[in-house]
């Protein structure tokens, strides 16, 4: 990759800096490769005994199932208990990766869901069913019977289920007669003190090579009483596991995401959801007790009480309007939480993803309106599990949710029906016309020189991910009639880099890469993201207690007694701050700068690392960062006032002798001549 041209000033010697060779790329998009199991791949009818039910045999009958669920209101749910079972492949991971997965990632991910979800306690031992050679089975006395024989091995994803976890093999002949227990099989010891068993492997499968797949998961067996998934699997992709500290939280979030697919957030499980009384939300076939099969998708088809298609008329796109059909999750708690989040009382529910094909569409939230919700189809920045996701799990009828475990979701919060029910083109156009912020969307094309900004929560330095694509986008994803500095007629090539967000451009974290290896990220809280001192042109400070602050429109400059250099990207940076005396104070280098009013430009002139750093930082409103701090003390931000005189602020100077200044002048002229000569040679 060639060096980008550096900005020049008259009489300035410019140095090509190593940072310019780095690629600034929007944050890693960890794509979910959830491959929902087909109907015939899932084993149903695992018999368990629920707490307070009469006996194991009753659990298989529909009457007992309804009776068990209807007693939920008078039976205390217990925290979900997940048992992890490792395949041998996990132990073959590199030591550093194994320790990370075994000691941190899986324990934290499992503990989160054990605290976030409660379930009717499973009493006694779980023995999983054996798989059958045929997709046809018979159910006799509540037990599933294979035709003639069971499979020699029962798999759950990439993992073979241990024999000690399996029940006996039950078989009938082809006509459903002569049903019996295969005398060659014995019941295993079973699984105790667990409500869900999770088989984990670490194999570099073909699915691992698709996108940036870190892990994938699904359920493999469901119990007889409530249809709740009771066993599942996850595969971790060894080559995609990063041990970098700044990527740990995203890795943990990815594993949490995959676990939730196995627990219930899956297109292959929606048809089995139940209401609070234990009644199926989707009608069942009388002869099988299962929902009707969608032959095309090879999954059980849900009813309109779970997911409903809605047509958005007059959906604004470049050059006009179209009708857009969306799939909405319309279960009661999801509807209530979605309406509360967006502040839109007429919102039908929560929109599901309509792109990405099998494994992404319908099995995730729509990226356009729930961008960093962890259950969207790709992780792009700061993923959170919101109340909306917990509401879905509770609406399955299998769990109670502990909403204190939800993380606040700022994306779209309180933005109303015009954000939640209309296109991003409408939102951008409407707010531009009213002189309002178009955030969380943006309209600044990503190009050199790169000008960064801050995310709305000020947790990260970010870029607008609006780029020129190599092809014209589909009409329904063309979101601009015109763009600054873009030739008329070419607007259809421009859109956000995240396709799942309908190519709506938005402010996004990014990473610095060198030879496709991540050097550092742009999230303020990670000390590992600090630039090296020789490359820290804006004197940033990443780590605990840091937030993002905007720079002024002018580029930052570094001067020594011999050189002056400007950096090819600027716009925002991460800095420590404090709140005292009713004011926000920003720490830069070894100095503290007081913000007297919103929009105040703090002029920075600090000598560090052999350079004089010159730039400016813009003060945000005090309440954005200090409001809650002062409120906890019974105080508040003081009203804005005139800033202190400039001589009250730190102002360093270079100490250069006359000889240094003379040498500097000569160096400038020589460098300018060499640069000019080089340019001419390059064009000859």
Curated annotation (Swiss-Prot):
Protein residues bound to Zn(2+): 257, 261, 364
The keyword Cell cycle is assigned to this record: yes
Signal sequence annotation: none
EC number, UniProt record: 3.4.24.-
Keyword Zinc listed: yes
PANTHER family: LEISHMANOLYSIN-LIKE PEPTIDASE
Protein's name in the database: Leishmanolysin-like peptidase
């Amino acid at each position: 990759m060639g060096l980008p041209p550096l900005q020049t000033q008259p009489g300035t010697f410019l140095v090509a800096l190593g940072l310019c060779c780095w690629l600034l790329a929007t944050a890693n998009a960890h794509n979910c490769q959830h491959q929902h199991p087909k109907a015939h791949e899932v084993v149903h009818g695992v018999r368990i005994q629920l707490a307070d039910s009469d006996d194991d045999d009753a659990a298989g009958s529909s009457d007992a199932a309804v009776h068990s669920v209807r007693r939920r209101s008078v039976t205390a749910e217990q925290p979900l208990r997940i048992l992890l079972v490792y395949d041998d492949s996990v132990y073959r991971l590199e030591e550093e990766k194994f320790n990370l997965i075994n000691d941190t990632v899986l324990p934290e991910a499992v503990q989160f869901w054990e605290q976030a979800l409660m379930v009717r306690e499973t009493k006694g031992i779980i023995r999983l069913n054996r798989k059958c050679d045929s997709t046809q089975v018979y159910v006799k006395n509540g037990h599933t019977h294979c035709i003639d024989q069971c499979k020699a091995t029962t798999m759950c994803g990439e993992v073979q289920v241990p024999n000690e976890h399996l029940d006996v093999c039950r078989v009938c002949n082809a006509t459903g007669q002569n049903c019996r227990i295969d005398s060659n099989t014995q019941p295993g010891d079973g699984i105790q003190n667990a409500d869900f068993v999770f088989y984990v492997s670490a194999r570099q499968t073909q699915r691992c090579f698709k996108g940036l797949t870190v892990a994938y998961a699904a359920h493999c067996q469901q119990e007889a009483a409530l249809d709740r998934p009771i066993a599942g699997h996850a595969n971790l992709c060894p080559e995609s596991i990063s041990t970098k500290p700044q990527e740990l939280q995203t890795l943990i979030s990815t594993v949490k995401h995959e676990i939730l697919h196995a627990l219930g957030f899956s297109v292959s499980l929606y048809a089995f959801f139940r209401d609070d009384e234990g009644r199926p939300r989707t009608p069942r076939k009388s002869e099988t007790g299962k929902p009707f099969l969608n032959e095309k998708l090879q999954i059980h088809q849900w009813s309109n009480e779970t997911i409903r298609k809605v047509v958005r008329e007059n959906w604004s796109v470049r050059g006009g309007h179209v009708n857009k059909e969306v799939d909405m999750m319309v279960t009661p708690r999801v509807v209530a939480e979605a309406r509360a989040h967006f502040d839109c009382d007429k919102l039908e529910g929560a929109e599901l993803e309509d792109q990405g094909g099998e494994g992404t569409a319908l099995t995730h939230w729509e990226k356009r309106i729930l961008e960093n919700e962890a259950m969207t189809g790709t992780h792009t920045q700061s993923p959170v599990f919101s109340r909306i996701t917990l509401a879905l799990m509770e609406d399955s009828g299998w769990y109670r949710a502990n909403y204190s475990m939800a993380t606040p979701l700022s994306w779209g919060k309180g933005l109303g029906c015009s954000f939640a029910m209309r296109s991003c083109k409408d939102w951008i156009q409407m707010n531009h016309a009213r002189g309002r912020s178009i955030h969380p969307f943006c309209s600044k094309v990503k190009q050199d020189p790169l000008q960064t900004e801050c995310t709305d929560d000020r947790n990260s330095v970010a870029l607008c991910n609006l780029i020129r694509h190599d092809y014209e986008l589909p009409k329904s994803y063309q979101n601009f009639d015109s763009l600054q500095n873009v030739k008329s007629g070419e607007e259809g090539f421009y859109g956000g880099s995240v396709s799942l967000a309908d190519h709506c451009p938005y402010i996004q974290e990014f990473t610095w890469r060198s030879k496709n290896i991540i050097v550092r990220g742009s999230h303020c809280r990670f000390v590992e993201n600090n630039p090296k001192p020789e490359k820290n042109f804006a004197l940033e400070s990443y780590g605990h207690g840091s937030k993002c602050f905007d720079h002024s429109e002018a580029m930052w400059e570094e001067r020594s007694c011999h050189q002056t250099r400007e950096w090819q990207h600027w716009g925002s940076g991460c800095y420590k701050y404090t709140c005292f005396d009713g004011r926000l104070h920003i720490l830069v280098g070894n100095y503290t700068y007081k913000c007297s009013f919103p929009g105040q430009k703090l002029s920075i002139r600090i000598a560090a690392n052999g350079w004089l750093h010159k730039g400016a930082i813009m003060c945000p409103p005090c309440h954005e960062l200090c409001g809650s701090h002062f409120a906890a003390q019974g105080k508040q931000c003081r009203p804005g006032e005139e800033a202190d005189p400039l001589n009250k602020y730190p102002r360093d100077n270079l100490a250069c002798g006359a000889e240094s200044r003379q040498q500097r002048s000569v160096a400038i002229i020589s460098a300018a001549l060499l640069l000019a000569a080089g340019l001419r040679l390059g064009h000859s």
